[in-house]
Structure formats: structure tokens, C-alpha cells
Design a protein with these regions (language model features):
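Structural alpha-helical scaffold elements that stabilize or flank donor/cofactor-binding regions
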Residues: 129-130, 187-188, 221
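Glycine-rich phosphate/adenosyl-contacting loop at the front of the ribokinase-like
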Residues: 1-63, 70-74, 256, 321-322
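Conserved N-terminal subdomain of the carbohydrate kinase-like
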Residues: 29-34, 40, 55-139, 311-322
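Short, conserved phosphate/pyrophosphate- and ester-handling motifs at nucleotide-, phospho-/glycolipid
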Residues: 53, 198, 262
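Active-site metal-binding loops of divalent metal-dependent hydrolases
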Residues: 14, 142, 264
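Hydrophobic beta-strand scaffold residues
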Residues: 60, 86, 166-167, 228
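Conserved phosphate-binding/catalytic region of the ribokinase-like
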Residues: 2-9, 34, 158-161, 207-322
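Conserved beta-alpha-beta core of the PfkB/ribokinase-like small-molecule kinase fold
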Residues: 136-216, 235-236
Length: 322
């Protein structure tokens, strides 16, 4: 497994997450609300993906940063075992509170913190050449790292020059989607090898309400051989590559905490790609991984390798072509 450690590199946002819930409705200003469940954990899209890789028995190197405070030191300790290489920013560590609603949706309150200072200049000295063969770099949380975002096109070019295939998960922009933002993201999309977005992000990036129409608009933006994986929540995922389109249903599960669902999908999907799986099989792996991981609470109860059986190859007869 040692050689696998450098086949998947994860670059993006990490922070301290406090997940609380469930709540029904929104509390009246000035009141206190008691909730039944909580967990303090390493979070952020990049950390969630790295943790999911570990649960699945895989290895990755996580490149990010923490702040120069006690939460940053705690976060560093949580992530070191995942192969993390973390710069230290002269800023407080980014904190996020995730409120879980009774309907299953979630609301986040996030401080800007150290992620505002994380830069390409901090990252580049820690970025090694890709391992020979099939190596992937996953980029996530771009909108929470504004300084790094300014060098995103440069970063993608550098990753390709180092031998990586690039997977991109933009996440949702706090400033919402605008024409200028769509044009900026389009330059990253056209240079990426795997585009991993959820249904709302696909419709927003394409500026179309209908998902099928949005997929049809985005696929011509992909370079030859690149894939689009659309995460459709409890329904599963849709994939498109070079004119092929397929759909995979997600396993049914009782879910309390959906935080990190998309990141867990990314981990399963990319590990399957690294294992040589095709589009349909990789979508299935992503759906299995996400359903299994978000069904567990607290997440700290999942041991490294505890879900490694999910990486077993499935017969293609279990997949639904479209």
C-alpha cells in the first residue's frame, strides 16, 4: 500500500468543524436551543476527503494549512496520520459550525480564518512530482481559499506538468454564482480531468434549471477523455465521458449527518479510478462510500480501513446505463 500513498493528492480547505443537531425550524433571535447530538472533528472538504480515503483503506497526501493557535495545533494532530503536510498561517484557524436540520439539510457558519491566507507560494514547495503511472490530484474548497484561488489556473498547469491528472470539486461559492464567476470556473473545468459537482452546482454553473440540459451544456466544456460526475444526493450519481452517460443509484441508508457526503463520494470515486475502474463502476464506488460514511455518527467511530470492503469491484450488471 505504500506506493498508493502518493497516487492521490488532496489540496484544499481544512478547518475545525462542530456539527450539531437536529433542529426543526430556525431559533428565535436571543434564545437558546438544546440539541441531542454533536461532534467536534477535523473538517473542510479536503480533510473530509482524506478521512474518507482512510476509512476506505486507502492512502493520500493532504496539502493544506492551519492557523497558529490551539485549534490549529489540534487540527494538525488530527490530520498528521493521514499523510498531511500543513503550512502554518499567521492567522486564527478557520472554524465551522454545521447545523443539521430535521429535514436532513444542513446550514454552515464558517469563519474566514487561516484559509484566507493559504497561498500557492505556501503550497508549491510541498508539492512533489506525481508517482509513476496513474496519479490524481483532487482540488476542493477553492472559494474558501481566495489567495490560492487567484493562482488556480497556474496550480492546475503545474499539477499537469508534474504528472497528475486533476480532479476538481469547486463546492458552493459563498458569494453565489455570477456570470464572471462562471467564466472563471469554466477555465478550470476545461483543464480538469475529473469534474465532481453536485446537482445544484451543475445547474448553477450551467445557469440552467433543468439538470439534463445543464449536463448537456457542461460536457462540451470538458477536454477529451475528461469525466463529469454529478452527485444527486440520495438518488445517486450521473456520469458523462466522451459521449457515454450512465447513472448509478445510491444505497439506501438512514442518515443524520450529511456533512461531507460529496467529499466521501469523491474519495470512493477517485480510489476506484486509481484501481482501474471505468466510469460506471467508479460512480457506484462513490455512491457506496458516501452512503456508508454519512450513515455513521459520530464519524470518529470509523477506524482507518474500517470500510475497506467497499472498494471491492462490483459486477457491471448492478449499474444502470442511460
Amino acid at each position: 500500500m505504500r506506493g498508493e500513498q502518493h497516487r492521490l493528492t488532496i489540496i484544499g480547505d481544512v478547518g475545525v468543524d462542530l456539527v450539531l443537531g437536529p433542529i426543526s425550524g430556525w431559533p428565535r433571535v436571543g434564545t437558546e436551543t438544546l440539541v441531542e447530538r454533536s461532534e467536534l472533528r477535523a473538517g473542510g472538504s479536503a480533510a473530509n476527503a482524506a478521512l474518507a480515503v482512510s476509512y476506505l483503506g486507502g492512502h493520500s497526501q493532504l496539502l493544506s494549512a492551519v492557523g497558529n493557535d490551539e485549534p490549529g495545533a489540534w487540527l494538525d494532530g488530527q490530520l498528521r496520520t493521514l499523510g498531511a503536510s500543513l503550512s502554518v498561517c499567521d492567522a486564527p484557524t478557520t472554524l465551522s459550525v454545521g447545523l443539521i436540520h430535521s429535514c436532513g439539510e444542513r446550514t454552515f457558519f464558517t469563519t474566514r480564518g487561516h484559509l484566507d491566507a493559504f497561498s500557492y507560494e505556501m503550497l508549491r514547495p510541498r508539492l512533489p512530482p506525481a508517482a509513476p503511472g496513474n496519479s490524481i490530484a483532487l482540488l476542493s474548497g477553492v472559494f474558501l481559499t481566495p489567495v490560492l484561488r487567484a493562482s488556480y489556473s497556474l496550480l492546475i498547469r503545474e499539477l499537469h506538468s508534474l504528472g497528475y491528472r486533476v480532479a476538481l470539486d469547486t463546492n458552493w461559492p459563498p458569494q453565489d454564482w455570477t456570470g464572471a464567476l462562471r467564466a472563471e470556473v469554466a477555465t478550470w473545468v476545461s483543464a480538469s480531468d475529473h469534474l465532481l459537482l453536485n446537482e445544484l452546482e451543475v445547474r448553477s454553473l450551467a445557469d440552467m434549471a433543468d439538470l439534463d440540459a445543464a449536463i448537456a451544456r457542461l460536457t462540451p466544456m470538458l477536454k477529451r477523455g475528461a469525466t463529469l460526475a454529478v452527485k444527486t444526493g440520495a438518488r445517486g450519481a450521473i456520469g458523462a465521458q466522451d459521449g457515454e452517460r450512465c447513472e448509478c443509484a445510491a444505497p439506501q441508508a438512514i442518515i443524520f449527518d450529511t456533512v461531507g457526503a460529496g467529499d466521501s463520494f469523491n474519495a470512493g470515486y477517485l480510489l476506484a479510478r486509481l484501481d482501474g475502474a471505468g466510469l460506471a463502476e467508479s460512480l457506484a464506488a462513490g455512491c457506496r462510500s458516501a452512503s456508508a460514511i454519512i450513515a455513521r455518527f459520530p464519524r470518529r467511530a470509523i477506524a482507518a480501513g474500517g470500510l475497506s470492503a467497499l472498494r471491492a469491484r462490483l459486477p457491471l450488471g448492478a449499474l444502470e446505463p442511460v
